[in-house]
Regions:
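A short acidic-Thr-Gly-centered motif at the start of a beta-strand
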Residues: 1-3, 151-152
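Extreme N-terminal starter segment of soluble prokaryotic enzymes
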Residues: 2-9, 47
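N-terminal beta1-alpha1 ligand-phosphate binding loop
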Residues: 7-33
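Glycine-rich phosphate- or other oxyanion-binding loops that anchor nucleotides, phosphorylated ligands
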Residues: 34-219
């Protein structure tokens, strides 16, 4: 693969979301260094890609995705991972479904002059998920959302996580193709037991990772 251009990076934030890609048909090629950490390069059906554990939080996601974008000149960012749902979401119905959000908001952005979720002088939201087939809004925060009071100003947001907004923003600012795949692990005010949440994260990661690998052949 010496002269092969790697154009895609698959990012996940929580270590519980990591999947053994070799069991899904991918082949480990080598490790690369990103911010003094080693991450694998895999090959799947003759397509090479980076598999990056960005770690939890908006800042980590932004740092790792920007570094990978600049260092390796990728053109595609795929982010898969767990998210929480509003209390109005039917958790049992949606638990095993993949979610493809349409808009991304920053839950930590609140000012007297802009609508909730908008950074000053930045777009109101990002709408660049090339997989978006559902009219869902996702909000990202450095806080885990577990109470309705935390998002009382965001009644228009359906799902919550701690990284997708950063991936959407970095993709937009670097003119990268962005693909976001989410799935439910919890719901505001319910099923907050850490063991149950982690179990849901691990279970959902399998189908999300399979989808991400299949996507490689189409982008």
């Amino acid at each position: 693969m010496k002269n092969i251009k790697i154009k895609t990076a698959i990012f996940y934030a929580d270590k519980q979301e990591q999947v053994n890609l070799e069991l899904l048909g991918a082949k480990f090629i080598k490790n690369v260094s990103v911010l003094d950490l080693n991450f694998p390069v895999y090959e799947y059906k003759n397509i090479y890609f980076f598999y990056i554990h960005s770690q939890i939080g908006l800042i980590n996601s932004a740092i790792f995705s920007q570094t990978v974008a600049v260092k390796f000149l990728i053109t595609n960012i795929i982010n898969y991972g767990a998210c929480g749902g509003r209390s109005s979401i039917d958790f049992s119905k949606m638990k095993n479904q993949l979610i493809f959000p349409k808009r991304f908001y920053l839950l930590d952005a609140k000012t007297p002059w802009y609508q909730p979720g908008q950074l000053p002088f930045e777009p109101k939201f990002y709408e660049n998920n090339l997989l978006a087939t559902q009219n869902f809004n996702l909000g990202s925060s450095n806080s885990f959302i577990f109470e309705e009071n935390q998002v009382k100003d965001f009644q228009f947001v359906d799902f919550f996580d701690m990284e997708a907004f950063s991936f959407a923003q970095i993709s937009a600012k670097n003119s990268l193709n962005f693909y976001c795949i989410k799935y439910l692990s919890d719901k505001i005010g319910q099923n907050l037991d850490i063991l149950e949440v982690n179990s849901n994260i691990k279970q959902g990661a399998q189908s999300a990772a399979k989808y991400a690998l299949a996507l490689l052949e189409k982008i």
